[in-house]
Amino acid sequence: VEPAETLELQCALAWPPVTGRWLGTWWFRAAGGFTGRANTALAIGDPGVPVTEALERVCEFAHSHGLEPAVQAVQHGPVERALAARGWVPNVAHEAGHEVSVLVGPLGGPAETARILGEPTPGWWELCAGTTEPSEAQRHVLTTAPALGYGVVEAGTETVGAVRAAVVDDVLHVSRLAVAPAYRRKGLAADLMAAAGAWAGARGATRCALQVSVANAPALALYHRLGFTEHHRYRYWVPATPACEDRSP
């Protein structure tokens, strides 16, 4: 089984922050608060300094970007144990869910009606980001990974399904899968996944990965039907006050 941290890094590279800084193999990320993944420190491997010092650097970076300090760590891994020993706690208040399942599965394909575009359309933005006028942070995170495709299903002039696809190494990273309410339960989500899989296979991908909150039962059920299984989980951790004071000027 591939180490969880390798897959974590591949998923993170598919979701680039506006600003990033490396400390050893830890990656500090900031993107104006748009998504937990792009605004936390991905703590994998060795930061190259003692963990206590690394966490101080996490705090300094977050505060300098107007963020609350937070770490993304593989569940039950050595980093979590180090965090707990230093007074950090799982961020149970995280709006989208602090515990996330990383699923892996087959590419699938071909699609029936879904297609992959080279540029996002207004309809894609509306479904995937909830707006046709994305913020600078939304646009950066969602459109600057190296190999990107924007999946859509259209009914006339209306975009009724959308998904984001990114290829990193041999992994297709799928995100922002959305279907308009009136068009759900018609197989569009599966068709979007198939289109993404066929597109990614032509670009060297051999498998698919995605990240889903463990609280999102409908999404987990869909992906399990499509042959996905859980590879590992990660959690968001935050310092218990006053372990991480804001020292920024």
Residue ranges and their predicted role:
Residues V1-H65, E80:
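N-terminal charged segments
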Residues V1-L9, R37, L42, G97-V102, ...:
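Short amphipathic alpha-helix that is part of the acyltransferase structural core
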Residues E8, L13-W15, F61, P78, ...:
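Active-site rim helix/loop that mediates acceptor-substrate recognition in acyltransferases
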Residues P47-G123, W237-V238:
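Acyl-donor-binding surface of acyltransferase catalytic domains
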Residues V51-C59, R176-P181, R185-A202, A221-R225:
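Conserved acetyl-CoA-binding loop-helix of GNAT-fold acetyltransferases
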Residues H65-Q75, A200-Q211:
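Conserved GNAT acetyl-CoA-binding A-motif
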Residues V71-V79, P181, L210-L220, W237-P242:
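Conserved beta-strand-loop-alpha-helix junction that forms the acyl-donor binding cleft
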Residues R139-A180:
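A conserved beta-strand-loop-helix scaffold within acyl/acetyltransferase catalytic domains
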